[in-house]
Amino acid sequence: MSDHHPLKEMSDSNSSPLLPEPLSSRYKLYESELSSPTWPSSSQDTHPALPLLEMPEEKDLRSSDEDSHIVKIEKPNERNKRRESEVSRRASAGRGGFSLFQAVSYLTGDMKECKNWLKDKPLVLQFLDWVLRGAAQVMFVNNPISGLIIFIGLLIQNPWWTIAGTLGTVASTLAALALSQDRSAIASGLHGYNGMLVGLLMAVFSEKLDYYWWLLFPVTFTSMACPIISSALSTIFAKWDLPVFTLPFNIALTLYLAATGHYNLFFPTTLIKPASAAPNITWTEIEMPLLLQTIPVGVGQVYGCDNPWTGGVILVALFISSPLICLHAAIGSIVGLLAALTVATPFETIYLGLWSYNCVLSCIAIGGMFYALTWQTHLLALVCALFCAYMGAALSNTMAVVGVPSGTWAFCLSTLTFLLLTSNNTGIYKLPLSKVTYPEANRIYFLTVRRSEEEKSPNGGSGEQSHGSGQWKAEESSETVLPRRRSVFHIEWSSIRRRSKVFGKGEHQERQTKEPLPCPYRKPTVELFDLDTMEESTEIKVEANTARTSWIQSSMVAGGKRVSKALSYITGEMKECGEGLKDKSPVFQFLDWVLRGMSQVMFVNNPLSGILIVLGLFVQNPWWAISGCLGTVMSTLTALILSQDKSAIAAGLHGYNGVLVGLLMAVFSDKGNYYWWLLLPVIVMSMTCPILSSALSTVFSKWDLPVFTLPFNIAVTLYLAATGHHNLFFPTTLLQPATTTPNITWSDIQVSLLLRAIPVGIGQVYGCDNPWTGGIFLVALFISSPLICLHAAIGSTIGMLAALSIATPFDSIYFGLCGFNSTLACIAIGGMFYVITWQTHLLAIACALFAAYLGAALANMLSVFGLPPCTWPFCLSALTFLLLTSNNPAIYKLPLSKVTYPEANRIYFLSQEKNRRASTITKYQAYDVS
């Protein structure tokens, strides 16, 4: 870093934290740091910030700058008088209330002056500062005063836990020093907070009584592993500029508890069991004072404390550093409490704050910490907290099966998902990790960036952020890396006609298309054969026969074109329909998007196919169809609200996961049909699909991979795990693992039912077991793409044969449960994302077979947790095969932005091959001439 960095100059010139400094000079310093090329780029040094009480200057940012370009000419005596008045005013302000204001600013925010003052002090004092900051960093607070208050709160809860937590922080910080980690990160406490949580929670979950001193040995060793895990995760997450949060703590604690367990002789842990019966809840017994007490208790549970006084003390510590962090902590705790009530959680669990602590952390992280605080990100923080609450319930129920607590896994996974969200909305601004400090300073940084970008824009600061500058320009450039599928199933029919010469059609047909036809039945002016090339001495009879033959052939060609053009309006992706609706009512456009979303489950971008699929769903079960349509509508609306790519929305790419969520939640509901309350969780879970899809796309864009139905799998798995069979409001179907050998008599097999399993397996993609529904789906696929229809049937057949090869019970085969994953895998590889050749056709069959066996494996594994496999086997197997690399030119993986449907994909591939060969021949000829 340069020696003339303004931050260093400030720290050198102001070694005493009690030296007053005007806020205006601090703001100028902040603005100079913003434009300085020597801004520290380390993603771990996240604390170059302003004091908290500089927030009131936020309102003067625009007004003070707008007048900066006005030149005022004044006389020398007037200038001297103005300077004297300013000096006297500043002096009076320094003698008055301003000194108190300045003194308070040294205790709030991240107390950077204190850190600078300690640089030349004994190492013991510096280390104490690091430990205190590490204790507060659990709640995203970089303030030693807050850390000291938090230690007081922990002592109120349990002194033994405090000792273990302190030891964990010290051991973790020392390990980071020994490993020569970034010194600024250590000084900010970023290598201490995970150790604090490890020490606390190991003491909390210990079955031994307090002051079991032998426990400090595993606390020391496990805490020392945190900097190693943190550094490793930072290396990976740096690709997406993401923080590691409390993942090192989660990994270390989970490994320790799984390694010891309840029956360990030296270090026994608390016994955790899954729910085995429906809870007995009487709503009249709910106690409002205890519910209100849950708010501070939920905040305290971040540190594993259930004492409301401890939670209150921690809230005070947060308020000292950042009132916005304190506010979002309380809001997050309330959201977790309300989410618990919506799924009939036992009151004791709610009163203990076990539903709230993950929401507290998520709400803080999204509400101003890693996103600049706007009303959009405030709402996003509420949604993230709600999503985190349900994910916490799902993980608690799932991990209880193996006797392990959920820790803060729910917070980490949900918040990372929301941080990976990409949006064209300028109000959703994710800060670079190196600029993250605390919400108030983050917002000032955001306003400064936006104002500077508005000044650089051609419009000169019209008050609306240009999408082509600054952060927003960076976001758009990153979206170009992620193939922006203007339509994943998109191809120009004119380009198909141009490329039709690849199949050997004559150039005369291309000339015919260039000439306008005033009437569709007009005889083409260009004949099939060029008569000028014939000899003048040809007999009249031969000329007449030739002319008649050419007229018949040209008429057949024209008729074939008319039929082909008519079919093109209802086959393929029906691009003409989408373009024709652009100037129509938004209602018709939205209906088109929803119908395309219904068919995109099967990789079909065709509204007519979508209508047939909806018809097939009503044939199966009208209630399921209603739930599925609602899921599609809500998922599409959410994508619009989040300003996702409009062309992807129009292609139905933000709707198909929603339809599967709605359908499968109705299928697995134990309440039966027309349980209207089920539509509430259908709406909530469907709305998470665009968020999950955007986050996964950000990750998968590194390898140019689609997200497939992973958002649906995540959403439905979380919902089913969070509710379960014993939930009072939303009970689900009971799934249990096999405990006995199935009784199979091969002579009892029925060939007719096996054949019927082919359409049933296709219908099971939507959760339907009606063969007529599966047949309607096949017709819908055939209308859009015969190749998709063919590979769907092949995939279902392969799944059935694979099930027979491992002696699967016949009922499972007849119901198509072994065929739907193979169906999707065969379509994806057989011409959809690979160009269709005989090699990729065989590859599709192999992928379908692999998906069938993987489906059986996951079904057996997930049944232990009471969960269905959904389409996890398809996603994992298809992604595995798409990551395949080969030197065989016939195995050609299409760029994601060029994927349409198999027939058009092959035309694109052949045209590329033709261009490549032509360029190769040209290069060879040029080389030969030279």
Swiss-Prot record:
Bias (Low complexity): 12-25, 32-43
Keyword Transferase: no
Basic and acidic residues composition bias: residue spans: 1-11, 56-89
Glycosylation sites: N743
GO molecular function terms noted in the UniProt entry: cell adhesion molecule binding; urea transmembrane transporter activity
Highest taxon of the lineage: Eukaryota
One Pfam family from the record: UT
GO CC term, one of those recorded: apical plasma membrane
Keywords: Cell membrane, Glycoprotein, Membrane, Phosphoprotein, Transmembrane, Transmembrane helix
Modified positions (Phosphoserine) in chain numbering: S487
Listed transmembrane segments: 145-165, 185-205, 213-233, 242-262, 280-300, 311-331, 350-372, 401-421, 610-630, 648-668, 676-696, 705-725, 774-794, 813-833, 842-862, 864-884
Subcellular location: Apical cell membrane; Basolateral cell membrane
Region (Disordered), start-end ranges: 1-90, 452-479
Protein's membrane topology: Multi-pass membrane protein
Family: Belongs to the urea transporter family.
Protein name, UniProt field: Urea transporter 2
Originating gene: Slc14a2
